[in-house]
């Protein structure tokens, strides 16, 4: 196999596996198991927060965990293929300039959650799936965003507002080269202290994360209107 073929397989596998995994909507799966359609109650969104409203905190928490796992597992599969299969066909120079393409699986997983193949392309808002993707990409991103999300949720009691603010903050911290420490490919703990990412890798993440942020804000347009009018459901109103 030549290098071009190896890179093509990496890109195709990343996008295909990520999208197919992301298309698994666990809120809909629990709907079938519990014989109660989450899309017919509450906000009608097949996501973790509405699952808490409809099915209770335990089921909603499971939906959040499973949705987040999609984003992480999609990357993990791609990383295994790349690390133990395709990498051997690449020179060191080509490897250093292409390994980050593995993270296309994270992008594809979020798109799959929003536009799922198995559910007529009508999915959720990809908050938890994005969280799982961040855990796969950079622990700094994940921890910063998790702390911000928890803080805003506790202060305002609005999960939707916390999610939107967190997405906005992430759109900014992506630009900080010291924070996007791609630990799956940089396993030396000491390197995390002096780490600084390449500009083209930062651009890569911006090119898919910034448009995703716009999509997520659009999907939350009804939530934004309800927040402005003081009609958005608070987390204290969950079961």
From Swiss-Prot:
Q: Give the membrane topology.
A: Multi-pass membrane protein
Q: Which GO terms describe its biological process?
A: phospholipid biosynthetic process
InterPro entries (UniProt xref): G3P_acylTferase_PlsY
Ranges annotated as spanning the membrane = 6-26, 61-81, 99-119, 135-155, 159-179, 199-219
Q: Which keywords belong to this entry?
A: Cell membrane, Lipid biosynthesis, Lipid metabolism, Membrane, Phospholipid biosynthesis, Phospholipid metabolism, Transferase, Transmembrane, Transmembrane helix
The UniProt catalytic activity note for this protein reads: an acyl phosphate + sn-glycerol 3-phosphate = a 1-acyl-sn-glycero-3-phosphate + phosphate
Specify the pathway: Lipid metabolism; phospholipid metabolism
Q: Hydrolase: is it a keyword of this entry? A: no
Its localization reads: Cell membrane
Q: Which GO terms describe its cellular component?
A: plasma membrane
**HAMAP family xref list:** PlsY
Record text on subunit structure and interactions:
Probably interacts with PlsX.
Query: What does it do?
Result: Catalyzes the transfer of an acyl group from acyl-phosphate (acyl-PO(4)) to glycerol-3-phosphate (G3P) to form lysophosphatidic acid (LPA). This enzyme utilizes acyl-phosphate as fatty acyl donor, but not acyl-CoA or acyl-ACP.
Family classification? Belongs to the PlsY family.
Protein's name in the database: Glycerol-3-phosphate acyltransferase
Give the organism the record lists. Mycoplasma genitalium (strain ATCC 33530 / DSM 19775 / NCTC 10195 / G37) (Mycoplasmoides genitalium)
